Amino acid sequence: MAVVHLDLYSYELAMNTQITLLLPERRGVPHTSRQGQPYPVLYLLHGHGQDHTSWLRLTRLESYLQNTDVVVVMPNGSRGCYVDGEQSHRYGTYLTEELPLALGNWFHLSPRREDTFIAGMSMGGYGALRAAMAHPERYAAAAGLSTAVRLDQMRDLPRAAERGLAIPPLEEVDRNFRCIFGPENAYESSPYSLKALARQLNDASGPKPRLLQLCGDDDPLLPANEDLAAFFADHCPNLDHTFQIDPGMHNFDYWDQAIRTALTFFGLPHT
């Protein structure tokens, strides 16, 4: 596959930013069966403290998609949680509006909802599920891998550190999240809450993306993911939601396998 490293100025972020893309191996080949059709697209989001190169450097993603006609878009979300923060950058609008428009024009991406998927791990899992539920008209399906369900709370981070997982200083993480989400006591009723968005989407008319939650059985974020899955089961009967627990921790060994489960869920061919 072709790997593209793109630097661009974002009007929503008001700064330069970066994107890594995987382009199909068969692009432009005379005997390809696509004959000018636009490409399906998978937006793939990284976690807190990572960047747009993490999926490509630390998993076998390119190998899995070697013979698939799909474009993978991996934006640099920095530590912005893929939302328009209270006192931070507009990563939500950048992800769901500016980026699809710009890349669609440059890389012949399909604008159709049924060809558009989004996934991510940890902070990116939160961003993927939130984007799909906040903009159900844009995405056919979304997958959250080891989703950081409550990004306003730091309760799971000390336990993660005890297991040897690399995390930034807790004070810095807490300061960053409060700039984005505001006071903790306002979170559950805010537009940042996955539960609030799920309930809103469940009660709304119109398209509803299929949702997948994956988590490792030794992940410190498992209790929060189980709680979110129970909420879907108890309060969102109109949503197509799947929750699956597999062996693994909060690391790329697990996410390397989990992304294949997500690709199968999306109906995207892979090895």
Predicted feature residues:
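Non-catalytic cap/lid and distal C-terminal segments of serine-dependent acyl enzymes
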Residues: 1-271
